[in-house]
């Protein structure tokens, strides 16, 4: 089972610390968070991409994916006027360009909250328009685009496996995939494995965390309530061969290396001995 480190937790340290820690602690790859000060797409375009490529080479650490910040601060393709929507889409396109240049395996985005007063037909119409434009761009440059479902605490657009199916049906692009952050189904009493049943080969990536079942908080494995050992055995039995990013975000920023080590050790302890 291949593991990835998410760099978001290192955002108060130089990004080289994330590459160094991923390498020294034994992660198989790294998922780059696209926010300042580390890897904001416009900053990469202005020259910062050279550092990212150099660090990947120095530490021999594959960049499994690039995840620009699209949950509303300041970019949210699902909310705001046409100028805001256009700015968000342009940023995501630039992120795909940067992902391509850093040889990332995918660009991962989400459909953030569309606003409490927005009716469903407007939400889904806007999502379809956005994804259609982004997928056309992804197809032109040869980049896989992953749409991440969020928890209902974060969004009212794509939050479960059926929402993902709807989005994929609206925009049937060979470059559009999805994934599952296992916190999202767990807090909605949705079986995690239903994503495997429903999405098939459109399920491209996993974010592994623990959950309290009542919030979008991402815990280190073992700190929440999820039956992770049993879940991982089911995932292995399904033949999943992609990466699992252990997605520590902002809760552990005071000691990212220590918690990244602990998270990886606990994750590996969940796996059968032959994995």
Swiss-Prot record:
Keyword Protease: no
Keywords for the protein's UniProt record, in alphabetical order: Cobalt, Isomerase, Metal-binding, Nickel
Keyword Isomerase annotated: yes
InterPro entries registered for this protein in UniProt: IolE/XylAMocC-like (IPR050312), Xyl_isomerase-like_sf (IPR036237), Xyl_isomerase-like_TIM-brl (IPR013022)
SUPFAM superfamilies for this protein: Xylose isomerase-like
Cofactor dependence: Ni(2+); Co(2+)
Catalytic activity as recorded in UniProt: N(6)-(D-psicosyl)-L-lysine = N(6)-(D-fructosyl)-L-lysine
Enzyme Commission code: 5.1.3.41
Signal peptide residues on this chain, from the entry's feature table: none
Domain of life: Bacteria
Active-site positions on this chain: 148, 247
GO molecular function terms noted in the UniProt entry: isomerase activity; metal ion binding
Binding residue positions for a divalent metal cation: 148, 181, 207, 247
Any Pfam family: AP_endonuc_2
Enzyme class: isomerase
Comment on bound cofactor: Can use Ni(2+) or Co(2+) in vitro, and, to a lesser extent, Fe(2+) or Mn(2+), but not Ca(2+) or Cu(2+).
Quaternary structure and partners: Homooctamer.
Function: Allows E.coli to utilize psicoselysine for growth. Does not act on psicose or fructoselysine 6-phosphate.
Family: Belongs to the FrlC family.
PANTHER family: HYDROXYPYRUVATE ISOMERASE (PTHR12110), XYLOSE ISOMERASE-LIKE TIM BARREL DOMAIN-CONTAINING PROTEIN (PTHR12110:SF21)
Protein name: Fructoselysine 3-epimerase
Organism listed in the record: Escherichia coli O157:H7
């Amino acid at each position: 089972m291949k593991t990835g480190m998410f760099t978001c937790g290192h955002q108060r340290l130089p990004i080289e610390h994330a590459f160094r820690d991923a390498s020294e602690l034994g992660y198989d790859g790294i998922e780059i968070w696209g926010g300042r000060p580390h890897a904001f797409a416009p900053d990469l375009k202005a020259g910062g991409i050279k550092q990212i490529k150099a660090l990947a080479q120095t530490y021999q650490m594959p960049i499994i994916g690039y995840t620009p910040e699209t949950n509303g601060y300041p970019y949210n393709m699902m909310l705001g006027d046409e100028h805001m929507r256009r700015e968000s889409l342009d940023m995501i396109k630039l992120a795909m360009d940067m992902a391509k240049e850093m040889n990332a395996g995918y660009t991962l985005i989400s459909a953030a909250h569309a606003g409490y007063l927005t009716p469903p037909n407007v939400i889904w119409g806007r999502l379809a328009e956005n994804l259609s434009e982004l997928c056309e761009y992804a197809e032109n440059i040869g980049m896989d685009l992953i749409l991440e479902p969020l928890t209902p605490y974060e969004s009212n657009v794509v939050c479960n496996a059926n929402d993902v199916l709807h989005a994929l049906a609206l925009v049937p692009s060979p470059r559009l995939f999805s994934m599952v952050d296992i916190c999202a189904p767990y807090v909605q009493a949705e079986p995690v494995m239903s994503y495997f049943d429903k999405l098939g080969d459109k399920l491209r990536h996993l974010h592994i965390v623990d959950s309290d079942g009542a919030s979008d908080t991402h815990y280190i494995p073992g700190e929440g309530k999820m039956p992770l050992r049993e879940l991982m055995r089911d995932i292995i039995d399904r033949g999943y061969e992609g990466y699992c990013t252990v997605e520590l975000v902002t809760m552990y920023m005071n000691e990212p290396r220590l918690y990244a080590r602990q998270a990886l050790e606990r994750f590996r302890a969940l796996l059968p001995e032959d994995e």
